[in-house]
């Protein structure tokens, strides 16, 4: 990962190296966080952030599904995203807003655990590699089944929901594939 200089954390910009959280963070133990993955691209009119209002809306919707009360409004988060790109002098970037529970009570009910928000932006080329567009990619069907949409809100981008995809990706790469397609369970099919 190509680190940038600054990360927005709980309302202020801090040096990348200083953007740390406790190993006792509820999210680290239980996967109770949400995020977005947003792209900024250099264009004829300058840097543009793809569908920023839609991404911010989904971040807030995902947070609501996980009972994370974001301590900032949408305008503050939108500006933090824009400023993260600008202050890091990025014309093209990957932007990762993350909402997560900090340190506090353990257990499945984080009722008095503080909610933190971070926004990181960095230079990240093509997701499947710079040659993928020209050379194509090798894709396999994973032995891991996609998590049922009845298990959690399928439109929420929850950090815990990506463990399934991580297992499948590790397996795919281990046998020389570039990417994967998870099996659909019967209840995922229309």
What are the residue ranges of the model-derived segments?
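Short, internal active-site loops enriched in acidic
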Residues: 100-105
């Amino acid at each position: 990962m190509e680190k940038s200089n600054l990360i927005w954390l709980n309302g202020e910009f801090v040096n990348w190296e200083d953007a740390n959280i406790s190993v006792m963070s509820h999210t680290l133990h239980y996967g109770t966080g949400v995020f977005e993955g947003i792209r900024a691209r250099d264009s004829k009119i300058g840097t543009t952030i793809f569908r920023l209002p839609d991404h911010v809306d989904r971040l807030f919707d995902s947070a609501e599904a996980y009972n994370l009360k974001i301590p900032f409004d949408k305008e503050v988060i939108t500006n933090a995203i824009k400023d993260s790109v600008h202050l890091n002098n990025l014309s093209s970037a990957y932007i990762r807003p993350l909402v997560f529970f900090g340190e506090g009570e353990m257990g499945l009910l984080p009722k008095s655990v503080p909610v933190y928000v971070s926004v990181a932006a960095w230079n990240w080329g093509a997701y499947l590699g710079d040659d993928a567009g020209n050379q194509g990619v090798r894709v396999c069907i994973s032995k891991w089944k996609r998590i049922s949409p009845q298990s959690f809100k399928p439109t929420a981008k929850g950090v815990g929901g990506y463990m399934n995809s991580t297992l499948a990706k590790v397996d795919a790469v281990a046998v020389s594939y570039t990417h994967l397609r998870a099996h659909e369970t019967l209840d995922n099919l229309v």
